């Protein structure tokens, strides 16, 4: 994922948490915040130390990152924070992608199709 598409700073995370909206399912919590000054979407990932060991947490982040990259073109330009919950450690890639797609649909984050 390119640097300009990452949320890294604590102040950016806090801004999204404080002013953004959230949706959740059993595996993930998704926070979003509309940023008119940004013309690209940015994503931040968070996996608690309560989930597995470092290898497991990094695996979860890789799966989320890949699923997000595949959906990136269809998503609105906003700031996103994805927080993994404990059940996320048991998911395969396909299940991770499906779970994230569910959250994106639930919060109407897909761009309108131009073919209509």
Curated annotation (Swiss-Prot):
Keywords: Endonuclease, Hydrolase, Nuclease, RNA-binding, tRNA processing. It catalyses: Endonucleolytic cleavage of RNA, removing 5'-extranucleotides from tRNA precursor. The keyword Hydrolase applies. One of its GO terms (molecular function) is DNA binding. Its EC number is 3.1.26.5. Pfam families: Ribonuclease_P (PF00825). GO terms for biological process: tRNA 3'-end processing; tRNA 5'-leader removal. GO terms for cellular component: ribonuclease P complex. It is an enzyme of class 3 (hydrolase). Gene3D superfamilies: 3.30.230.10. Consists of a catalytic RNA component (M1 or rnpB) and a protein subunit. Might be a component of the prossible RNA degradosome complex composed of rny, rnjA, rnjB, pnp, pfkA and eno, and possibly also rnpA. Interacts with RNA helicase CshA. RNaseP catalyzes the removal of the 5'-leader sequence from pre-tRNA to produce the mature 5'-terminus. It can also cleave other RNA substrates such as 4.5S RNA. The protein component plays an auxiliary but essential role in vivo by binding to the 5'-leader sequence and broadening the substrate specificity of the ribozyme. Belongs to the RnpA family. This is Ribonuclease P protein component. It comes from Bacillus subtilis (strain 168).
């Amino acid at each position: 994922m390119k640097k300009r598409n990452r949320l890294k700073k604590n102040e950016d995370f806090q801004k999204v948490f404080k002013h953004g909206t959230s949706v959740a399912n059993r595996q993930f919590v998704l926070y979003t915040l509309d940023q008119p000054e940004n013309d690209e979407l940015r994503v931040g990932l968070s996996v608690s130390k309560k989930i597995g060991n470092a290898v497991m947490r990094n695996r979860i982040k890789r799966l989320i990152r890949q699923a997000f990259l595949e959906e990136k073109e269809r998503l609105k330009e906003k700031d996103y924070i994805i927080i993994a919950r404990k059940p996320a450690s048991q998911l395969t890639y396909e299940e991770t992608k499906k779970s994230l797609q569910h959250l994106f649909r639930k919060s109407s984050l897909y761009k309108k199709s131009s073919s209509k």
